[in-house]
Amino acid sequence: MDKVNFPYRSDSHLPFLHVVHDSGSWEKHGLDVNYDYEISSEDSHKNVANGTVEFVGGNHLSPYIRRPAGDKWVYLGQTVSLLNHRLVVRADSGINKVSDLKGKKVATKGKHPGLNTWLFIKQAGLLNECHVEKAKGSKFHWEAVRDGEADAAFVTPPADILSKRAGLKVIEVPFLPMVWFTTVSSGLPFVEKHAEIVDRMLRGICEGIAYFKTHRAESIKIIKEKYKAEGDLDDETATHLYEDLKKILQGKPYATIPAIANVYEISIEQDRAAEKTDPMALWDFHYLRRIDDSGFIDNLYRT
């Protein structure tokens, strides 16, 4: 059994990662994966480069920014290519659709999630029509809406249900093509030296996705018992989180072109240095392609 580190950049990845781990999907491929801890963007680059971390779950913007300076980051697989967000507002706000955000304050969280909101609003033609601001303190950004500190926020499950229970109105909006959530990331020197571990890591991810999609009750149980980042989940919230994630998880974890285009755009918004990196330069799907061509992934779904 080979030990590898696979820290996440956001604890929102954990509902999926807990299922991959607890289903034995990595273990089946001879890997003992240390996945249940967070890593900063800075430490991701430093620790992958010095070999103390083999893989990182995520890190979606800084690699585009750092590549012109010689960074060797590489993306090997992408579990989702859609951001499954909803708009939440106060019930008496008069907001019923995205265009109603004109003149309103929209609360966000974090750098990448905040830029997702920025891009969605930009694509809706509202960039100079509303104010996007990170929620203050440690509260969830939907709580800023509840408390009257903002007019709206974009949230992902289970926060939509939690918002509704707090009296907010949940508005369905189109999902945004985006590279986010669990991406299998590493450094090119490690990947070239350990192709066999890369192969097993990706097989474990594919196996975990298949288990998630085909073992509903078991996956919901794991999520309910182990995912605590947004408080204890009951049956309704755990089931909703599962069902929504199941819809967007990709059986074959290739990033879509619209998702890559959008993450590239927000990386440039964060730092213009990213313009010097080609949007496709960080992606290497040939390890996944070999697994796919072998029939391994298709066989996971054959009964």
Where are these regions (language model features)?
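Conserved C-terminal helix/tail region of periplasmic/extracytoplasmic solute-binding proteins
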Residues: 264, 268-303
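Secondary-structure end/capping motifs
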Residues: 194-275
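Pocket-lining segment of extracytoplasmic ligand-binding domains
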Residues: 61, 140-229
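Short, glycine-/small- and polar/acidic-enriched structural segments
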Residues: 1-133, 138, 151-155, 170-178
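Small-molecule pocket liners
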Residues: 81-87, 179-184, 188-189, 263
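Predominant activation on well-ordered alpha-helical scaffold segments within soluble catalytic domains
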Residues: 18, 64, 118, 161-164, ...
